[in-house]
């Protein structure tokens, strides 16, 4: 679907304050690397990642999303009362219940008429949130929407390192949990609105989606552990990207 009446009012982000280098992680994993014969520059060589960001202390996904949302709302010039929907798209969440969106909604003091809910779809969730909100704006249901995301990778990074340092951890364990140590922390938020109300906004014309859900088992994770078939995920992901574009 192509949109004719949707524009981006603002986009903002929050960087987690602490830089955690790949070298630091590998140094902590040195006993396991030596035991399994794994080189210590694997992150840079395989993933191209030299560092990632983490929070300083106990920052929840809703905390992070709220900080980004406050910046985005201020940059947009839109009043809190004008926002008709809040969609949280974080992979991480504060709790199974209530929704992280409801916590962010309360933190921001949005109107009780503002819909709020979580949308979970891994790293594509933010785009899905944009699309859901844009359809509502296009139909005239609402005038403005707020899409947020807040991620906290501290817990999964620490738990993964702890598991890989166990004497019984194997090379297969390392390969399956390697991707968990590439994750970082941060937050982002976007305000969308009717283009007629945002003469200086950037048009949002639409999106394209394709699915290959027969491969959904290639990466499975929860808050403290993620297991990934990295090679197959890359190969099949590239095939899907080629089919899409």
Would you name each region that the model predicts?
Residues 68-84, 243-245:
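Phosphate/pyrophosphate-binding loops at sites that engage ATP/ADP/AMP, CoA/4′-phosphopantetheine
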Residues 36-43, 95-109, 156-168, 215-219:
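Acidic-glycine-rich active-site phosphate/pyrophosphate-binding loop
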Residues 50, 82-87, 108-119, 168-175, ...:
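Glycine/charged-rich beta-loop-alpha catalytic/anionic-binding loops adjacent to active sites
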């Amino acid at each position: 679907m192509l949109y004719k009446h949707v524009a981006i009012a603002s986009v903002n982000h929050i960087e987690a304050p602490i830089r955690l280098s790949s070298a630091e992680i590998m140094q902590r994993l040195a006993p396991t690397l030596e035991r399994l014969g794994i080189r210590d520059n694997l992150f840079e060589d395989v993933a191209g990642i030299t560092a990632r960001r983490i929070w300083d202390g106990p920052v929840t996904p809703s905390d992070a999303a709220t900080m980004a949302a406050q910046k985005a709302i201020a940059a947009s010039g839109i009043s809190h009362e004008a926002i008709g929907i809040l969609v949280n798209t974080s992979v991480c969440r504060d709790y199974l219940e209530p929704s992280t969106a409801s916590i962010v909604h309360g933190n921001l003091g949005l109107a009780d008429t503002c819909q709020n809910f979580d949308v979970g779809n891994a790293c594509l969730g933010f785009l899905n949130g944009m699309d859901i909100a844009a359809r509502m704006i296009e139909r005239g249901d609402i005038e403005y929407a707020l899409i947020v995301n807040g991620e906290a990778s501290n817990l999964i990074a620490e738990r993964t390192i702890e598991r890989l340092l166990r004497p019984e951890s194997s090379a297969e364990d390392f390969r399956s949990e390697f991707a968990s140590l590439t994750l970082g922390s941060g937050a982002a938020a976007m305000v969308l609105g009717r283009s007629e109300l945002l003469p200086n906004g950037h048009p949002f014309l639409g999106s394209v989606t394709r699915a290959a859900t027969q491969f959904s088992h290639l990466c499975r994770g929860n808050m403290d552990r993620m297991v990934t078939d990295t090679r197959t995920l890359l190969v099949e992901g590239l095939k899907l990207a080629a089919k899409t574009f």
